[in-house]
Amino acid sequence: MSSLAFRTLRNGLGLKSSVRALSTTTTTLSNYQQPDYSSYLNNKSGQGSRNFTYFMVGSMGLLSAAGAKSTVEAFLSSFAASADVLAMAKVEVKLGAIPEGKNVIIKWQGKPVFIRHRTADEIEEANQVDIKTLRDPQNDADRVKKPEWLIMLGICTHLGCVPIGEAGDFGGWFCPCHGSHYDISGRIRKGPAPLNLEIPEYDFTDDETLLVG
């Protein structure tokens, strides 16, 4: 074989070898499986999200706790009675200033209180009533500590209006709002009110002084 032919054959074999090597490399690259990092990334992302969530929840918890503390403190402080309220918890009344047969209205804890200096005739009238006929049966003696002094809350037991004294069909009090009539003992006798006028806590500190509350 001539040297020219030999070189040509050698070059051809070299080219084929190069082509085969390139083909093998290409096949190897095409079969290469890239590692899957998704789970790792997802885990990191999930952990980051959880950490952020924990941070936000913790922050909101602290803010909520602080807000709740302020609310509770404000709520409790609203129950702290002021000096004015404490001063009105009890009211002293000088009875010598109230003539017999007359009413006086005082204010106690924001409510009207009726004080009636009853006459002997009024006391007798109150005691002559048959309590079996009353809607809210009460003896007059159970409503007073001293027969001549009747002390009641001036609030109609129907819807809370203030009755008028020395009025009505029974010589006691009349509520103009819905027509309830109370007798000289403050007992309901006619109209929609279900109960007698309420008796507040009171005491006589001496013969001339009444303490309401």
Curated annotation (Swiss-Prot):
Pfam families: Rieske, UCR_TM
Cellular component terms (Gene Ontology): mitochondrial inner membrane; plasma membrane; respiratory chain complex III
Protein name (database record): Cytochrome b-c1 complex subunit Rieske, mitochondrial
Cofactor requirement: [2Fe-2S] cluster
Protein's gene: RIP1
Phenotype on disruption: Leads to hypersensitivity to azole treatment and sharply curtails fungal growth in the presence of macrophages. Leads to decreased vegetative growth on several carbon sources including maltose, citrate and acetate.
Induction: Expression is induced in high iron conditions. Expression is repressed in alkaline conditions, by niric oxide and during spider biofilm formation. Expression is also repressed by HAP43.
Domain Rieske intervals: 116-211
Protein location: Mitochondrion inner membrane
GO biological process assignments: mitochondrial electron transport, ubiquinol to cytochrome c
Assigned keywords, A-Z: 2Fe-2S, Disulfide bond, Electron transport, Iron, Iron-sulfur, Membrane, Metal-binding, Mitochondrion, Mitochondrion inner membrane, Respiratory chain, Transit peptide, Translocase, Transmembrane, Transmembrane helix, Transport
Entry similarity comment: Belongs to the Rieske iron-sulfur protein family.
InterPro entries, A to Z: bc1_Rieske_TM_sf (IPR037008), Rieske_2Fe-2S (IPR017941), Rieske_2Fe-2S_sf (IPR036922), Rieske_Fe-S_prot (IPR014349), Rieske_Fe-S_prot_C (IPR005805), Rieske_TM (IPR004192), Ubiquinol_cyt_c_Rdtase_Fe-S-su (IPR006317)
Primary location class: mitochondrion
Function: Component of the ubiquinol-cytochrome c oxidoreductase, a multisubunit transmembrane complex that is part of the mitochondrial electron transport chain which drives oxidative phosphorylation. The complex plays an important role in the uptake of multiple carbon sources present in different host niches.
Cited SUPFAM superfamilies: ISP domain, ISP transmembrane anchor
Membrane topology: Single-pass membrane protein
Listed EC numbers: 7.1.1.8
Residues bound to [2Fe-2S] cluster: C156, H158, C175, H178
Disulfide bonds: C161-C177
Residue numbers on the Mitochondrial matrix membrane side: 30-47
